[in-house]
Swiss-Prot record:
Role: Catalyzes the hydrolytic cleavage of the carbon-nitrogen bond in imidazolone-5-propanoate to yield N-formimidoyl-L-glutamate. It is the third step in the universal histidine degradation pathway.
Annotated 4-imidazolone-5-propanoate binding sites: R87, Y150, H183, E250, S327
Enzyme Commission code(s) on record: 3.5.2.7
Catalysed reaction, written as an equation: 4-imidazolone-5-propanoate + H2O = N-formimidoyl-L-glutamate
The keyword Metal-binding belongs to this UniProt entry's keyword annotation: yes
Keywords: Cytoplasm, Histidine metabolism, Hydrolase, Iron, Metal-binding, Zinc
Cofactor(s) of this protein: Zn(2+); Fe(3+)
Protein name: Imidazolonepropionase
One MF annotation (Gene Ontology) recorded for this entry: zinc ion binding
Subcellular localization, as worded in the UniProt entry: Cytoplasm
Length: 423
């Protein structure tokens, strides 16, 4: 007997069309079962099909979804989850046109977050991050990548990674930990970036032994770390057994996209300034392009990543919030879906694949997350919508009704008035 059987699902988005990264037309294809049903037993999906096919199945609990839509739990593959403080005091300065470097000189910017993170205890960081994870869950996210990077010293970086490890044990969301010690060059290492990177590399063996990080990341940008420094750093991290990511070409076409493809990074993230050559190299690689349009939006920039061109040329594109206190303070992945549709010219189908299948591969979870398939853990979302296009269309709010994590209800909004949109 099943533990739970979901029936009368108007649209069941299984996302289960093929294994591996989705590109081109596959990104614009959604496997949808009309009038679907899903069976769950011991936290695992044991049945996926139509309501007609589900007849005769018995379950301890039968949930009538009343024609609403069900999808896999969403995957957010790029966040800066663990940090201290906030930076709302900088908004007025930005609106006045105060340059970021001047804000830094006043103790603001990333330095403000670094100082707040250093001053916070691990438990304070954990409790703050739990609040943000709860919000992510309420938006339908069940798997999250979490970066360090607000320490710029060994003690605080360890504290962030240990906080992430504790959160993995205490929160229902699955976390994937990334070491981003190379987020910026500390003042004391100004002009000595290679020495700083060596210091960060020296931390990796113990980090690997304690299993505190799965990925290593670096911020490759003008005035931070060069392409050659980034490649050398990440290749050494790979030699130590880590998978790697790269903050690439966020502002300038520095060659970060090319570097990511060349070294076989799991993902290249941002890519607003990615060159045509970089896009071509990504298309011919297994590196996921993780685009962060919420950051461009919040920074009030006019130029967004060329998501349409990337998809048309065969790049596997994912979407993420880039949740962080400075350049994208939002946990709302649904808002990111809407911005991607409007500003990156992605179709609703492409947007859904970018927050499920491709985003799972960006963090090496393609075999466990992002799809509804028999044998996989039951991470499911019941939406207050009748069709998938309605979610990114009706922007700025959450359409989530209920979230199941490993077959258990992890979030429910309860009885609400909801859309009567039809296809």
């Amino acid at each position: 007997m099943l533990d739970t059987l979901l029936i009368n699902i108007g649209q069941l988005l299984t996302m289960d069309q093929e294994d591996g990264l989705l590109r081109r037309e596959a990104m614009n294809t959604l496997p949808v079962i009309e009038n679907g049903a899903v069976g769950i037993e011991n936290g695992v999906v044991t049945f996926v099909g139509t309501a007609e096919e589900a007849k005769g199945l018995q379950a301890k609990e039968v949930i009538d979804c009343d024609g609403k839509m069900v999808s896999p739990g969403l995957v957010d593959p790029h966040t800066h989850l663990v940090f201290g403080g906030s930076r709302e005091n900088e908004i007025a300065l930005k609106l006045q046109g105060v340059p970021y470097l001047e804000i830094l000189e006043q103790g603001g910017g990333i330095l403000s977050t670094v100082n707040a993170t250093k001053q916070a205890s691990k438990e304070e960081l954990v409790q703050k991050a739990k609040f943000h994870l709860d919000r992510m869950l309420s938006f339908g996210v069940t798997t999250v990548e979490a970066k360090s990077g607000y320490g710029l010293d060994d003690e605080t970086e360890w504290k962030q990674l240990e906080a992430t490890a504790q959160l993995q044990k205490e929160h229902s969301i699955d976390l994937v930990s990334t070491f981003l010690g190379a987020h910026a060059v500390p003042k004391e290492y100004k002009g000595r970036s290679k020495e700083f990177l060596q210091w960060m590399l020296d931390l990796l063996p113990e980090m690997k032994e304690k299993q505190l990080a799965e990925f290593v990341d670096i911020f490759c940008e003008t005035g931070v770390f060069s392409v050659e420094e980034s490649k050398e750093f990440l290749l050494k991290a790979k030699e130590l057994g880590f998978d790697v990511k790269i903050h690439a070409d966020e502002i300038d076409p520095l060659g970060g996209a090319e570097a990511a493809a060349e070294i076989g990074a799991a993902s290249a993230d941002h890519l607003v300034g990615a060159s045509d050559k970089g896009i071509e190299m990504l298309a011919n690689s297994n590196t996921v392009a993780t685009l962060l349009p919420g950051t461009t939006f919040y920074l009030n920039k006019e130029s967004f990543a060329r998501g349409r061109k990337m998809i048309d040329e065969g790049v596997a594109v994912a979407l993420a919030t880039d949740f962080n206190p400075g350049s994208c303070p939002t946990e709302n992945i649904q808002l990111i879906m809407s911005i991607a549709m409007l500003k990156l010219k992605m179709t609703p189908e492409e947007v859904w694949n970018a927050v499920t299948v491709n985003s799972s591969y960006a963090i090496n979870r393609g075999d466990v997350a992002g799809k509804i398939r028999v044998g996989r853990k039951a991470d499911l979302v019941l939406w207050d919508a009748y069709n998938y296009a309605y979610v990114p269309y009706h922007y700025g709010v959450s359409h989530v009704n209920t979230v199941w994590k490993n077959g258990n209800i992890a979030y429910t909004r309860g009885e609400q008035s909801w859309s009567t949109a039809t296809i």
